[in-house]
Swiss-Prot record:
Domain of life of the source: Eukaryota
Species assigned in the record: Homo sapiens
Name recorded for this polypeptide: Protein FAM222B
Family of this protein: Belongs to the FAM222 family.
Pfam families named in the record: FAM222A (PF15258)
Region (Disordered) location: 155-203, 219-245, 537-562
One Gene Ontology term, aspect cellular component: mitochondrion
Compositional bias per record (Low complexity), positions renumbered to this chain: 155-167, 183-201
Taxonomic classification: Eukaryota, Metazoa, Chordata, Craniata, Vertebrata
C-alpha cells in the first residue's frame, strides 16, 4: 500500500501567507493550515495497524506530521486499551523527521514491528485486542502438591507406620544370640525429616524389661503424631536422596517406655542409667552403651550430656563383652532420632567427662564406678598378657561398615574404634577437662579434636623422638584407659618396644584417672604403684591440668582420633 501524505508545506499556502503577511492571517488561512496538517484519528490508526498486521509486506511512508498516542497522553484509550504506556500502544512510535521516509517492512508472525530508529512496537491482532472474558486456562501442575493431597498422604503414611509398629516383631530374639539382618528394617528406625525444637532422640526405646521378654513381646505403645508429624517411614522405604539417620540402642532396652506424655530426655537417660546399674553384674557391658549418632544441631550439647550419662558404666577395661559377643554391637536394632544435623558424634565416646553428670549425685556415681572398676579389674587380672592376640584379631574383624578407615591395631580398642567424621558441628561442643594427659583441648574450627600424635612428640631422653610411639591409651567416656588397669600384665606390655617413656606416661594417666574419681577409688589394682606416685593425683579440682614440666604427658592421646 502506497500512502502519500502532504509534505511539510503547500506551495500555494506559502505564497498566500507571504503576500498577506502584513495584514495578518485570515480565518480561512488558519483552517487551510489545519487541513494541511492531517492528524489521523485513533480509529484510523487502529484500522491501519490491523491492516498492516495482516499484510506480510507493507510499504509505508512516515511523514513528520503523523501523530500517534505517546506515553505522555495519560489514560488515553484505543478500543478500551490504555495507551499511556508503550506496552499497550498498538502503534509504533515515530521519530521527528523533517521529511517523509519510505520503508519496506516485513511483518513477522508475532506482529512485532521494528521501527527504523530501533524501537519495536507490538501490533495486537484481533484476538489480543479483544480479549475473551473466559477465565484463565488451567495452569500446568506445579511441584507443590495440594494441601488435601498432602494431608491424605501424611495420614496414609501414619497409618502404615502404625500398622507396622503394632505388628509383633518376629525378628526380635534373645540379645545374646545374633539377630537376623531383617531386624534392621524394623519400624523402630523411622525417619523424621523435619527438626524438632526439643530433642526426641529415643522416642520408642529404652524399656526396662529383661532381654528375654522381647522374644514374645511386640511394641505396644502407640505413636505420637505430634512428635513425628505424618512423615515417618521405615528406613527400608526411604528414597535414595534422603539420608536416614539412626541411633543404635540395644534391643534389651527397646520396649515399654511410658508414652502418656512426651518423654523428656533427662528422664529417659535416668531410666537407662538405672537399667545399667541393675545389669552391672552381667558381663554384657555394651548393652548400656548409648550409641547416639547424628545429633540435632539445636540440642547437640544435650545429646552429648545424654550420651555421657548413658555410658555411665564405661570403665577402663579391654571390654570383654566385645570378644564374647562381637556381633551384638553390629546387629543392634536402630531407634528413632531426629535427622537434622550433619554432625556425627562418635558412638560411645563422649567429649563431656563422665566424672561430672548433671542429674545424678556424685556419691552414687562414684560408688557405681567403683563397683564396675573393681569387677573389670578382677576380670582383666585373669587374662594373661599373651592372650591379647586373640582380642587383637577380634578387633580387626569388628572393623566393619560402621568404622571409618582401617581398624587400629590396639587390643583395647575393640569397642572404642568408633566412626569419626570430620564434619564441622554447628555448635561448639563442651570442652572436656584434660583427663587424657593433654595440656588443654584444642579448639579447632570443626570441634575440640586432639592434635595428631606425630605433631607434638617432644624429644625426651628416653624416647627416640621419631614419631613411632603409638601409645595405646583409648579415650572412652572421658576417662583414659590403658595398660595399668590390666593388673596381671607387665607395666609396658601394651607399648611398642624401643619407647622408653611408656610406663611413666601410663602412670601419669593413671594418676589422673584416680584424680577424676574424686579420691574415692579403692586402690585394688594399683598395689605395685608407690604411695609417692599416688600422692600426685590428689590435687585441687581446679589444678587438674598436668604439670607443664612433665613433657611425657603430652604423648598420651587417643589413637582413634588420628
Amino acid at each position: 500500500m502506497l500512502a502519500c501524505l502532504p509534505g511539510p508545506g503547500d506551495l500555494s499556502f506559502q505564497l498566500l501567507s507571504h503576500t498577506q503577511m502584513n495584514t495578518g492571517l485570515q480565518k480561512w488561512d488558519t483552517t487551510q493550515k489545519m487541513r494541511t496538517a492531517h492528524y489521523p484519528t485513533p480509529a484510523e490508526l487502529d484500522a491501519y495497524a490491523k491492516k498492516v498486521a495482516n499484510n506480510p509486506l507493507t510499504i509505508k511512508i512516515f511523514p513528520n506530521s503523523v501523530k500517534v498516542p505517546q506515553r505522555k497522553h495519560v489514560r488515553r484509550t484505543v478500543n478500551g486499551l490504555d495507551t499511556s504506556a508503550q506496552r499497550y500502544s498498538p502503534y509504533p512510535t515515530q521519530a521527528a523527521t523533517k521529511a517523509g521516509l519510505l520503508a519496506i517492512v516485513k511483518v513477522p508472525a508475532k506482529s512485532i514491528l521494528k521501527d527504523f530508529d530501533g524501537t519495536r512496537a507490538r501490533l495486537l491482532p484481533e484476538a489480543i485486542m479483544n480479549p475473551p472474558v473466559a477465565p484463565y486456562a488451567t495452569v500446568a501442575p506445579s511441584t507443590l502438591a495440594h494441601p488435601q493431597a498432602q494431608a491424605l498422604a501424611r495420614q496414609q503414611a501414619l497409618q502404615h507406620a502404625q500398622t507396622l509398629a503394632h505388628a509383633p516383631p518376629q525378628t526380635l530374639q534373645h540379645p545374646q544370640g545374633i539377630p537376623p539382618p531383617q531386624a534392621l528394617s524394623h519400624p523402630q528406625s523411622l525417619q523424621q525429616p523435619q527438626g524438632l525444637g526439643h530433642p526426641q532422640p529415643m522416642a520408642q526405646t529404652q524399656g526396662l524389661v529383661h532381654p528375654q521378654a522381647l522374644a514374645h513381646q511386640g511394641l505396644q505403645h502407640p505413636h505420637n503424631p505430634l512428635l513425628h508429624g505424618g512423615r515417618k517411614m521405615p528406613d527400608s522405604d526411604a528414597p535414595p536422596n534422603v539420608t536416614v539417620s539412626t541411633s543404635t540402642i540395644p534391643l534389651s532396652m527397646a520396649a515399654t517406655l511410658q508414652h502418656s506424655q512426651p518423654p523428656d530426655l533427662s528422664s529417659i537417660v535416668h531410666q537407662i542409667n538405672q537399667f545399667c546399674q541393675t545389669r552391672a553384674g552381667i558381663s554384657t557391658t555394651s548393652v548400656c552403651e548409648g550409641q547416639i549418632a547424628n545429633p540435632s544441631p539445636i540440642s547437640r550439647s544435650l545429646l552429648i550430656n545424654a550420651s555421657t550419662r548413658v555410658s555411665t558404666h564405661s570403665v577402663p577395661t579391654p571390654m570383654p563383652s566385645c570378644v564374647v559377643n562381637p556381633m551384638e554391637h553390629t546387629h543392634a536394632a536402630t531407634a528413632a532420632l531426629p535427622a537434622a544435623g550433619p554432625v556425627n558424634l562418635p558412638t560411645g565416646i563422649s567429649r563431656v567427662p563422665t566424672g561430672y553428670p548433671s542429674d545424678l549425685k556424685p556419691v552414687t556415681w562414684n560408688q557405681h564406678q567403683l563397683a564396675h572398676l573393681q569387677q573389670m579389674c578382677s576380670e582383666a587380672s585373669g587374662t594373661p598378657a599373651p592372650g591379647l592376640t586373640g582380642k587383637h584379631a577380634a578387633g580387626r574383624e569388628l572393623a566393619g561398615p560402621g568404622f571409618v578407615g582401617k581398624a587400629p591395631a590396639y587390643p583395647q580398642e575393640l569397642c572404642l574404634a568408633q566412626s569419626f567424621h570430620l564434619k564441622p558441628p554447628l555448635e561448639k561442643p563442651t570442652p572436656s577437662p584434660p583427663v587424657n594427659g593433654m595440656a588443654a583441648p584444642l579448639a579447632y574450627p570443626n570441634g575440640h579434636y586432639f592434635q595428631p600424635l606425630w605433631n607434638n612428640i617432644l624429644p625426651t631422653p628416653n624416647s627416640d623422638s621419631s614419631g613411632s610411639q603409638d601409645l595405646a591409651m583409648p579415650f572412652h567416656g572421658g576417662q583414659p584407659t590403658g595398660a595399668p588397669l590390666d593388673c596381671a600384665a607387665a607395666p609396658g606390655a601394651h607399648y611398642r618396644a624401643g619407647t622408653g617413656g611408656g610406663p611413666v606416661a601410663s602412670q601419669n594417666s593413671l594418676m589422673q584417672t584416680v584424680d577424676y574419681l574424686s579420691g574415692d577409688f579403692q586402690q585394688a589394682c594399683f598395689r605395685e604403684q608407690s604411695l609417692a606416685m599416688l600422692s600426685k593425683a590428689h590435687r585441687a579440682p581446679g589444678n587438674r591440668a598436668p604439670d607443664p614440666t612433665e613433657s611425657r604427658s603430652l604423648h598420651i592421646q587417643h589413637p582413634g582420633y588420628r
